[in-house]
């Protein structure tokens, strides 16, 4: 898939506006735990462009390093998502409490520039918003493009489309499903190591009787995946399910999803099984392993993800 363009030329833009870094309250990135909030400051650059500084922990309990010494690409995806929420709240005035509904999310990580050291990694996330539609003076939908630099080197790019809805509109849209509820897994996890995890509590898949198909496990007490009461399965949990399914179908060789593209079609509900299926596909280039992952619930497509990563030996 194509990478997002590099959006901000830091050298040419450095003197165009007053450069004052602004702090990031956790509410603006929809997190309640400081260890799960990655943007730390932001600067408006003008013309629907922003620069966000983010820090990546080297020892996050959920977004742990992959393949021994690389930052998890899904940690990058989550950082991009938080940077987008930040600029729409702080830069455009979308009220806190509005729902941030992502329809697509694509990313490309350059693993050579995402090595893990003994300290936090500081990233500069360039954010550009486009195709904005406004209602009542604030955006209701748009496209976001990101370019991530670490020590001046391009470490990742991404693009997404998203919508924003008020609590009132969201409740009407969700109807009987709008009430947050709890979910406790009633099925055993697949072995953590086979799913690319080290802890059973982070495994979101259970075995099924069908080949290369697993049942989604949802535990609303998970401290990272569920920061607050929710009425549906979060998109980042679905991305994690896709990653784990890719690990299972490509194992025993490790799978690192350095490239990902996801289309979210409908909500995954708590009250019905969601089935995750993975298929190895021809890769976009030599040396890459590609997996197509789908989620279905009650016979309908919930999401479609394509993940690619370096072909490692087992």
UniProtKB/Swiss-Prot annotation:
InterPro entries: AfsA-like (IPR047757), AfsA_hotdog_dom (IPR005509), HotDog_dom_sf (IPR029069)
Disulfide bond positions: none
Domain of life of the native organism: Bacteria
Keywords associated with the record: Transferase
UniProt cross-references to Pfam families, sorted A to Z: AfsA
Single GO molecular function: transferase activity
Keyword field contains Transferase: yes
Reaction it catalyzes: a medium-chain 3-oxoacyl-[ACP] + dihydroxyacetone phosphate = a (4-alkanoyl-5-oxo-2,5-dihydrofuran-3-yl)methyl phosphate + holo-[ACP] + H2O
Enzyme class name: transferase
Disruption phenotype: Deletion of the gene leads to a strong perturbation in the expression of three pigmented antibiotic clusters. It also affects the secondary metabolite cluster responsible for synthesis of the siderophore desferrioxamine and expression of the genes encoding enzymes for primary metabolism pathways, which supply antibiotic precursors and genes for morphological differentiation.
SUPFAM superfamilies for the chain: Thioesterase/thiol ester dehydrase-isomerase (SSF54637)
EC number of the protein: 2.3.1.277
Family, per entry: Belongs to the AfsA family.
Function: Involved of the biosynthesis of S.coelicolor butanolide 1 (SCB1), a gamma-butyrolactone that triggers antibiotic production.
Protein name (database record): 2-oxo-3-(phosphooxy)propyl 3-oxoalkanoate synthase
Organism listed in the record: Streptomyces coelicolor (strain ATCC BAA-471 / A3(2) / M145)
């Amino acid at each position: 898939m194509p990478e997002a363009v590099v959006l901000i030329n830091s050298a040419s833009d450095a003197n165009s506006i007053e450069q004052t870094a602004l702090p990031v309250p956790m509410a603006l990135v929809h997190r309640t735990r400081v260890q799960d909030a990655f943007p730390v400051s932001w600067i408006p650059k003008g013309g629907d462009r922003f620069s966000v500084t983010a820090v990546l922990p080297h020892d996050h309990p959920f977004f742990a390093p992959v393949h021994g010494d690389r930052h998890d690409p899904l940690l990058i995806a989550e950082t991009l998502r938080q940077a987008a929420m930040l600029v729409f709240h702080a830069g455009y005035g979308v009220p806190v409490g509005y729902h941030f509904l992502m329809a697509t999310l694509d990313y490309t990580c350059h693993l050579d520039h995402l090595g893990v050291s003994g300290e936090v990694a500081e990233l500069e996330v360039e954010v550009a918003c486009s195709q904005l539609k406004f209602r009542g003076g604030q955006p209701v939908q748009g496209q976001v493009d990101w370019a991530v630099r670490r020590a001046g080197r391009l470490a990742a790019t991404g693009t997404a489309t998203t919508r924003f809805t008020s609590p009132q509109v969201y409740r009407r849209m969700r109807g009987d499903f709008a009430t947050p509820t709890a979910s406790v897994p009633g099925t055993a996890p697949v072995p953590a190591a086979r799913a690319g995890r080290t802890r059973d509590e982070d495994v979101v898949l259970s075995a099924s009787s069908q080949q290369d198909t697993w049942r989604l496990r949802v535990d609303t007490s998970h401290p990272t995946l569920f920061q607050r009461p929710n009425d549906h399965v979060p998109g980042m949990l679905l991305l994690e399910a896709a990653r784990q399914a890719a690990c299972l179908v490509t194992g025993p060789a490790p799978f690192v999803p350095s490239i990902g593209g996801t289309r979210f079609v409908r909500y995954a509900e708590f009250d019905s099984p969601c089935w995750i299926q993975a298929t190895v596909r021809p890769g976009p280039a030599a040396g890459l392993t590609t997996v197509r992952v789908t989620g279905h619930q009650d016979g309908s497509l919930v999401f479609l993800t394509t993940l690619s990563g370096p072909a490692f030996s087992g």
